[in-house]
């Protein structure tokens, strides 16, 4: 198995990050001070602590985990079950030519499996991860009721899990140099383009980056990836200041309801966006009568309690 000796300088620098020093480390540590239940939770390794993730899952049905891939690297490489844990991703891991990219890939799946396992209360190795046509990760079999999403860039790994509906996550470096002139027609609706064009350059770049990550997160949640044109839908703020879908063809439909969109800066290092849709709870189904005991029309059995989200 490829290991530390072929990791390359980038991976060794990541491995050396036993703690969270530097600007990103400070930003991740600061997440613990946030009270917002929609904020990402920093998990420094497989041993957690996972309490905040469990709290968010119990309270909202979804949670977002973030970490530095170097902090999970040793645990991933020394795990004797890494190959079965990666499953169908093992060939891609082995065939990725650049060592740092190969290890980052393995760690990202390692983090996603451990986060999903925590949400489901199972062992990470028991989960079977597959991919839809657009690249969206899906858990099959045992974890089929849990939605998952993954993003990684530079040092950062971001994983979203949801028991209550689709979820998508995206992250970009906060200092990413993006050209409004080149991307306007590809990313923005006409209204969004006009609003951004009226802003000072620095504010416009920051707003465009935030918009980009929101649209990435939304299309990931839908499972469309880059197949859906970003300029075909937009975002705006409603009367309460919440981010909502806008500029939809034909005014939208019922499938556009129930979405929540949030963006969080990780200090001055990254911009993180999350799209999550809470689906209606399934209607309770009545129990079938026991064999040989016809149900009394005057004494119907209690309906089956809906599954806890």
Where is each model-derived feature located?
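Core catalytic alpha/beta fold that binds nucleotide/phospho-ligands
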Residues: 2-309
């Amino acid at each position: 198995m490829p290991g530390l000796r072929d990791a390359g300088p980038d991976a060794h620098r990541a491995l050396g990050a036993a703690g969270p020093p530097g600007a990103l480390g400070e930003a991740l540590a600061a997440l613990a001070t946030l009270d917002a239940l929609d904020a990402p939770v920093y998990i420094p390794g497989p041993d957690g602590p996972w309490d905040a993730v469990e709290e968010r899952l119990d309270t909202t049905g979804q949670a977002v985990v973030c970490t530095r891939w170097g902090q999970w690297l040793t645990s991933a490489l020394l795990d004797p079950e890494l190959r079965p844990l990666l499953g169908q991703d093992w060939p891609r891991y082995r065939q990725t030519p650049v060592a740092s990219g190969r290890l980052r890939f393995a760690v990202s799946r390692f983090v996603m499996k451990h986060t999903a396992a925590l949400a489901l209360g199972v062992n990470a190795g028991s989960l079977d991860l597959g991919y839809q046509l657009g690249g969206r990760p899906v858990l099959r079999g045992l974890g089929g009721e849990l939605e998952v999403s993954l993003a990684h860039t530079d040092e950062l790994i971001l994983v979203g899990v949801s028991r209550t509906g689709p979820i998508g996550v995206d992250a970009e470096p906060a200092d990413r140099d993006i050209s409004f002139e080149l991307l306007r027609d590809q990313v923005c609706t006409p209204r969004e383009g006009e609003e951004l064009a009226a802003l000072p350059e620095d504010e416009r770049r920051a707003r465009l980056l935030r918009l980009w990550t929101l649209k990435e997160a939304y299309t990931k949640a839908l499972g469309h990836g880059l197949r859906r044109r970003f300029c075909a839908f937009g975002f705006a703020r409603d009367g309460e200041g919440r981010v909502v879908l806008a500029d939809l063809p034909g005014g939208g439909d019922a499938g556009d309801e129930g979405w929540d969109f949030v963006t969080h800066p990780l200090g001055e290092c990254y911009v993180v966006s999350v799209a999550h849709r809470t689906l209606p709870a399934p209607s309770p189904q009545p129990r079938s009568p026991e064999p040989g005991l016809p149900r009394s029309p005057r004494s119907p059995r209690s309906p089956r309690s809906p599954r806890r989200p």
